[in-house]
């Protein structure tokens, strides 16, 4: 221990490095490759009191399996309405994620997720808390949370105008900022914490909203920068149809970026081979050009392979026709590596099964243990084939070593990677 601190003193005295990672530092590091994982309490709808319980030791066992598969990253999904439902259980689970990730050498991005806006608007949906809807007749209960639903369009339009307030008159943006700060305060001092995603796949309904999203992302980024120097991720929008009337283009997507781009990543989803046909290639090229415009690296926060079929005016996921083969996985991940993306996360890891087979990396029956499906094997083999065995695999540290790493980072003189390198070298010296 004395040797470690002697090394630290020498290092600190010879450096004036700040604590932020630049874009070049982000892209020069070994890539992160992993999974999108759903939790238990953090994924509950606000009125959910009947979901099947998670397996015993779900987080711990999952992270061990993920690490054993040669993966080094988890994009961990949570929902704001689950926090409003039970803040204590929510934060307890978030902390358990950070502790287990430290143990197994995984890097976590904590993802503020929404799907179809909120369960207030749609039974299947999860996302925004009910306090933002209650008492406002404009957002009728069950009014629909998808992009084509009028109630959802009203909500998102008001959200970008920053006119949404709860019954007590509290501003929605400020409330989300305070919520995200609770996550940061709970896990930021963990070596496993890579960063935070502001809001997954926000809705865009007209051409005038692109710049407003940029103002929102700038506000949240500025607020979080008061308490963290770790990576902040902002997300692509939905719908992402190239033919939609919202005028999707690299120029407009670039308007979503926060004004402070230090240590920022841009999350996009890829659910087909990027160069599989003209449409998919054009779509992926649009993301690459957006990254070039902003100087912000691409983070493929979701990837898989699906088939969509037309139902009226919209295309919907077809679970029966969707499949992921070894060839598909190699083509997708190969294209992503060639593009030099910052990291990837496969959709998805969850103890609750869904109809699309390839969305299930593990299976679970009550009373049994988590069991890997063939898709975990495909993912493991593909990552090893494309990136090499255990590329970017992170060392594990015990509690004492993690505490030291965190203390070194808090000095403001060492980045997290530098602190880890110092501690690792001291361990090797003995």
Region roles according to the model:
Residues 4-14:
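Bacterial N-terminal signal peptides
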Residues 13-23:
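Sec-dependent signal peptide cleavage junction
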Residues 27-250:
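Active-site mouth of glycoside hydrolases
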Residues 36-52, 96, 286-288, 307, ...:
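Membrane-proximal envelope and lipid/glycan-remodeling enzymes
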Residues 55, 167-342, 363:
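Extracellular glycoside hydrolase catalytic/binding regions
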Residues 293-407:
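Substrate-binding cleft of secreted/luminal carbohydrate-active enzymes
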Residues 412-419:
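Intrinsically disordered, low-complexity coil/linker segments enriched for acidic/polar
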Residues 429-430:
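Short, solvent-exposed mixed-charge patches
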């Amino acid at each position: 221990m004395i040797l470690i601190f002697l090394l630290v003193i020498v290092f600190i005295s010879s450096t004036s490095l700040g604590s932020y990672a630049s874009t070049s530092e982000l892209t020069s590091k070994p890539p992160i490759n992993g999974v999108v994982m759903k939790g238990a309490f953090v994924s509950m709808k606000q009125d959910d009191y009947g979901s099947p319980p998670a397996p015993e030791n779900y987080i711990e066992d999952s992270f061990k399996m993920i690490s054993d598969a040669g993966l080094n990253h988890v994009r961990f999904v949570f929902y704001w309405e689950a926090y409003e439902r039970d803040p204590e259980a929510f934060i307890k689970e978030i902390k358990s994620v950070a502790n287990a990730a430290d143990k197994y050498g995984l890097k976590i991005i904590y993802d503020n997720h929404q799907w179809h806006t909120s369960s207030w608007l749609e039974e299947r949906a999860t996302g925004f808390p009910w306090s933002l809807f209650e008492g406002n007749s404009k957002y009728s209960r069950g009014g629909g949370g998808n992009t084509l639903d009028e109630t959802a369009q009203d909500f998102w339009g008001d959200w970008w105008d920053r006119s949404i307030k709860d019954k007590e008159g509290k501003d929605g943006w400020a409330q989300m900022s305070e919520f995200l700060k609770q996550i940061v305060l709970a896990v930021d001092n963990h070596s496993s914490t890579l960063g935070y995603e502001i809001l997954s796949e926000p809705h865009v309904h007209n051409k005038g909203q692109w710049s407003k999203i940029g103002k929102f992302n700038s506000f949240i980024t500025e607020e979080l920068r008061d308490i963290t120097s770790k990576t902040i991720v902002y997300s692509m929008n939905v719908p992402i149809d190239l033919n939609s009337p919202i005028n999707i283009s690299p120029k407009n997507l670039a308007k979503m970026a926060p004004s402070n781009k230090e240590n920022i990543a841009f999350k996009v989803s890829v659910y087909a081979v990027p160069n599989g046909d003209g449409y998919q290639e054009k779509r992926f090229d649009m993301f690459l050009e957006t990254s070039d415009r902003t100087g912000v690296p691409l983070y493929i926060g979701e990837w898989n392979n699906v088939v969509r079929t037309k139902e009226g005016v919209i295309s919907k996921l077809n679970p029966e026709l969707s499949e992921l083969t070894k060839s598909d996985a190699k083509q997708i991940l190969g294209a992503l590596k060639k593009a030099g993306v910052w990291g990837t996360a496969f959709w998805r890891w969850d103890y609750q099964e869904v109809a699309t087979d390839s969305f299930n990396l593990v299976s679970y029956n009550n009373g049994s243990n988590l069991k890997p499906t063939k898709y975990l094997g495909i993912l493991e083999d593909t990552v090893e084939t494309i990136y090499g065995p255990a590329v970017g695999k992170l060392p594990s540290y015990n509690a004492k070593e993690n505490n030291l790493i965190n203390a070194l980072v808090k000095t403001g003189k060492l980045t997290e990677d530098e602190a880890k390198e110092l501690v690792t070298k001291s361990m090797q010296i003995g």
